[in-house]
């Protein structure tokens, strides 16, 4: 039997394969159910136990050699095809399957670029946040509904949570930097809400903060109006009184869109209590803050009727957004 194995090895040493059909014939000949290797293993069962050690080792080496030859010829065949493709300059080029920007990314960067023009710089922070930065420092009283389990994702056995807004970034920045401050903080935020066509447990916000001496509500209105004009074009807007724990006075801005008033921005003058919490003198400095949901604006611009489309990774949907609006 060792002589058979030796003769097969000699045959393998000089074998040459030039096509896919020859390679398949070689595979079946040696590794098929009725192939040479199977026949040898059947014969191996009948030999004397004293010879099995040496013959078994030779058989396994032969099997590995045959499999390696198949892999080698497969590689050479592929390389040959690749070389032909490179050399054949008459063949048509391959179309590249290019991706496209996500609609939320398109809107987010458009907003950022507008505020960059008037001196706002980007500032980011962690999505897992301490209660101090997300609530306490922002003047949320202990009885505020946002502190309840039904509105916020709290992390068990800790004073951490998933941030409910990017205002927490403003607190972190004010703790380490003194006025003048002019920042915007884009990012993901989380609310314990039922997922539906108009709400989601995770969405994106951009919030802004301007802090300096003698900043007034007039400065807030002019900044917001600058954004509206550059983003939406000539539009009819209105400011309505509102309430936020971290601003006083507070307002919401509505835009007339398809003959309906739609709320798109919450804003107001930074509450003096918030400034005291970050060791900034409210008698010397004042400022304003604002925030907007990116999904809401994206739904408006692209006339999309279901927020869930943004998170389903459906290429039929995503491929529609190849250019800036």
Curated annotation (Swiss-Prot):
Keywords: Aminoacyl-tRNA synthetase, ATP-binding, Cytoplasm, Ligase, Magnesium, Metal-binding, Nucleotide-binding, Protein biosynthesis. SUPFAM superfamilies: Class II aaRS and biotin synthetases, tRNA-binding arm. The keyword Protease does not apply. It catalyses: tRNA(Phe) + L-phenylalanine + ATP = L-phenylalanyl-tRNA(Phe) + AMP + diphosphate + H(+). The keyword Transferase does not apply. One of its GO terms (cellular component) is cytoplasm. Its EC number is 6.1.1.20. It holds the Pfam family Phe_tRNA-synt_N. Mg(2+) binds at residue 248. GO terms for molecular function: ATP binding; magnesium ion binding; phenylalanine-tRNA ligase activity; tRNA binding. It is an enzyme of class 6 (ligase). Its cofactor is Mg(2+). It is found in: Cytoplasm. Binds 2 magnesium ions per tetramer. One of its GO terms (biological process) is phenylalanyl-tRNA aminoacylation. CDD domains: PheRS_alpha_core (cd00496). Belongs to the class-II aminoacyl-tRNA synthetase family. Phe-tRNA synthetase alpha subunit type 1 subfamily. Tetramer of two alpha and two beta subunits. This is Phenylalanine--tRNA ligase alpha subunit. The lineage of its organism: Bacteria, Pseudomonadati, Bacteroidota, Flavobacteriia, Flavobacteriales. The gene is pheS.
